[in-house]
């Protein structure tokens, strides 16, 4: 039997898809690409935006057109957040949520065997539930491994449907994380990325902390780089920063969630910090890791309800002033079940899209300038994608994309380079 996966959304979703693929392989299935015909099609959905829901439905329709006899599965955040709507999608033979992923295999078998015509298996998240272990040892990139350490979010930001889609904070057992890291190191992975729905919340439900996990992860032989997923700035304290800076394996690249550079908009979004507090945390990280050594990335929403032109200009000024290496810009998506859904002064779609284009153009200029400022510096690069026998793309510790000729090296090697010119997509570099 052949199974294929279509994944939308964040690194956590990608990690979970990989774990599901491994589960199906271990039970006799062959995992194939989206372009190949399959007996089972699994859509791992994202519901952060309306567009994500639309793409999930579109892919299910495509799967049924390609193979009307196949079993189609809709799983993940979309069904969990909107179970009634998801259950009505006729093209989905199996509908499951963001929990109890192990049951997908059994649900699929029920339909394949004719025991059930359709399976709707969406289970509500409950307070006190435990982290669901989904072991994973193989990654498509073969060089960087994503390790999920936490699920759920206890915050209630006005725009965000994720707490509804993912449930409360649930931390993975520390011993389980470290055991997976040891397996990955034995398999040759040199860089790991700790991913989560609310990464700084790790350990808040189990008496430990993210910093403790980072320190112990750094002790795993063979792991040379540790990278962090998204961080909420207000959850980073002075002692956390001091301890993280002492971990030499920790990549000095921080994805600090911002969402807006306007204080009025941040208050409306129910984000628990001001732009001044955000800038202060970034300044402390720069001081601890070295101003020329650290980089920042972030997410920004434009067109939030009530955002005036002046608010947008203030946000853009703050964002460009922070000198982010990369910014993900999103036009606000109105999500049912969130506080902002009922806010007055909803902006028209064309205005949100226009602001998205303006913000994107501004942050791309900053990205190019930041990359150009690194020209001539020495950096270590993890070789990832071979373009030829000797040419590779890869990333520095600061997550700067690099193109380098490295004869005699292979994917997965870490090499020392001198950074060169920025070509609009990546830095050209030469081996030291």
Walk through the language-model features, giving the residues of each:
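Terminal RNA-binding accessory module
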Residues: 342-432
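Proteins enriched for Cys/Gly/acidic motifs involved in redox and nucleic-acid/cofactor modification
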Residues: 1-202, 239, 244, 250, ...
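Conserved glycine-rich "GG(E/T)P / GGGxP" loop and the immediately following alpha-helix
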Residues: 47-52, 189-216, 220, 232-239, ...
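Hydrophobic, well-ordered secondary-structure elements that form the walls
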Residues: 256, 299, 319, 327, ...
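Short, surface-exposed connector motifs at secondary-structure boundaries
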Residues: 2, 67-68, 220-227
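Conserved strand-turn element in the central/C-terminal portion of the radical SAM core barrel
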Residues: 160-167, 225-234, 260-270, 291-311, ...
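Contiguous mid-protein beta-loop-alpha structural module that forms a pocket-lining wall or clamp
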Residues: 307, 322-324
């Amino acid at each position: 039997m052949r199974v294929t996966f279509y994944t939308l959304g964040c690194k956590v979703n990608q990690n979970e898809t990989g774990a599901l693929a491994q589960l199906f392989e271990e039970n006799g299935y062959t995992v194939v690409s989206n372009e190949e015909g399959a007996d089972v099609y699994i859509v791992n959905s994202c519901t952060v935006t309306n567009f994500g829901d639309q793409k999930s439905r579109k892919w299910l329709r495509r799967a049924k057109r390609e193979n009307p006899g196949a079993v189609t599965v809709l799983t993940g955040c979309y069904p969990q957040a909107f179970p009634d709507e998801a259950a009505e999608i006729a093209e989905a033979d199996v509908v499951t949520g963001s929990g109890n992923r192990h049951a997908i295999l059994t649900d699929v078998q029920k339909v394949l065997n004719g025991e059930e015509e359709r399976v709707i298996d969406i289970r509500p998240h409950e307070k006190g539930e435990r982290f669901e272990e989904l072991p994973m040892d193989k990654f498509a990139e073969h060089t960087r491994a994503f390790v999920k350490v936490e699920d759920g979010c206890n915050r209630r930001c006005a725009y965000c449907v994720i707490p509804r889609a993912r449930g409360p904070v649930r931390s993975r057992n520390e011993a389980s994380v470290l055991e997976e890291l040891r397996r990955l190191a034995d398999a040759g992975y040199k860089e790991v990325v700790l991913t989560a729905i609310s990464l700084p919340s790790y350990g808040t439900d189990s008496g430990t902390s993210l910093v403790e996990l980072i320190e112990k992860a750094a002790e795993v032989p063979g792991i040379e780089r540790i990278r962090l997923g998204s961080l909420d700035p207000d959850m980073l304290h002075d002692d956390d920063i001091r301890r993280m800076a002492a971990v030499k394996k920790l990549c000095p690249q921080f994805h600090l969630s911002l969402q807006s550079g306007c204080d009025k908009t941040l208050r409306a979004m129910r984000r628990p910090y001001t732009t001044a507090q955000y800038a202060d945390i970034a300044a402390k990280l720069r001081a601890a890791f070295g101003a020329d050594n650290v980089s920042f990335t972030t997410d920004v929403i434009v067109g939030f309800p009530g955002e005036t032109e002046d608010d947008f200009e203030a946000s853009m000024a703050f964002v460009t002033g922070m000198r982010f290496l990369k910014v993900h810009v999103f036009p606000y998506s109105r999500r049912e079940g969130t506080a902002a859904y009922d806010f007055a002064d909803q902006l028209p779609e064309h205005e949100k899209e226009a602001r998205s284009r303006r913000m994107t153009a501004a942050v791309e200029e900053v990205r190019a300038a930041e990359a150009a400022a690194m020209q001539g510096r020495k950096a270590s690069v993890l070789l990832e994608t071979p373009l030829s026998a000797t040419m590779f793309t890869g990333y520095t510790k600061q997550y700067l994309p690099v193109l380098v000729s490295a004869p005699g090296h292979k994917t997965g090697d870490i090499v020392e380079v001198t950074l060169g010119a920025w070509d609009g997509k990546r830095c050209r570099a030469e081996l030291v």
